[in-house]
Amino acid sequence: MKRILAIAFLFAFCFAVSAQQNFSAANAETKAQHDQRMRWWREARFGMFIHWGLYAVPAGEYNGKRSDRIGEWIMEWANIPRADYEKFALQFNPVSFNAKEWVRIAKEAGMKYIVITSKHHDGFAMYGSRVSKYDIVDATPYHRDPIKELAAEAKKQGLVFCFYYSILDWHYPAAYVDAPGKDPTAGNRTTKLKPGGKEEYLKYMKEQLRELVKGYDPGVLWFDGEWQDWWTEEDGKALYAYVRSLKPSIIINNRVGRGREGMKGLSKTDQTYAGDFGTPEQQIPPSGLPGVDWESCMTMNTTWGFKFYDDKWKSAEVITRNLIDIASKGGNYLLNVGPTAQGLIPAPSVERLAAVGAWMKMNGESIYGTTASPFASQLAFGRATSKPGKVYLHVFDWPGDGKLNVPAFGKDVKRAYFLTHPKTALTFHQVDPGGSLTLGLPSQALDPIATVVVLETK
């Protein structure tokens, strides 16, 4: 027994050392190289998240029961047996899916990249996988690869195509759910792996990731489901290195490893963790994260995967101001849609994205390629973003007296104007060099969501 334990310990130690060495090699890039790899993503600021899978079939209801929990977790919260859940594949026939239309909706909303679920926690692959028949091509009457169509269309329309991939897998044969029958509302049940199952599953996962990276050329791999106790930071570093070996320029989120703190999605700082950016979920860091790349992923209602009865929609104003708020703090906004089992993006999502797109068409310059607000604290009247030589003031609360008081930010202002009317100068008064200033504004805001004032600096 002692000999067996010693061998097991030696194997684990060697794996950890190898993982660290591979991670270090994959991460051996200069700051300039890292900045170049991250450049397009940092400039994009706005992307579409798509949660689409078998869970769209029950759409939040199983055996007449509904839940306020998220739709893509229905297999877990409804305690659906694996064999019964598999039957949803026979009903999954998204004949209304139109890749050109989906990408058009994203592009016209002002989004620059798309992240879609290639495999969520339920283990069902939304592409044609050679290592599993539990996919949309082989297991459904649809028999098409919508991911391939979407990737081609995204490239055609100029958007960067990206993948979500779940480390957690409720379907894989070597996995099983701890404490079956436990009340799901009491907390997420833990997925375990059978003896020897980890090595088997890692091989399977890496083969699927190779298919995705080599077959679809994604710009980002967005991992999730890393919280299981069998997944370690060493595993995360090894997987990060593996994916970067397949495509050195790819960007990978921090959920590949164990470096996030709950739903804050931020990288811990007690050691070097795997991943290129943090992932706050359903929240915006109050003061941003200076010096850290991050992306807030958020829903338009209360679910990621489609639920037919979830009508708690955020307004277009809230969504647009979220985008502005996130950009003002130096982050990206990954906004979710949950398509139906028929392959349609819900109408309320389409309507809101069109409204955001209308604002972005006029004001996108104040979002794309910007950096965080230059002000020491959050502005009372709205938010701000910046570029070399320019500061963009996003005015949410219009001053009733026609005077906008702007705090000092260490720069001399030489000109002020509305972004939508660049040839018409606004009056302003700046008492001291680099000091606070007062802008003269008309009685009514130009835009009810956010009027953008540009300050050109010396």
Segments (PLM) and residue ranges:
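Positively charged n-region of N-terminal signal peptides that target proteins for export
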Residues: M1-I4, A106
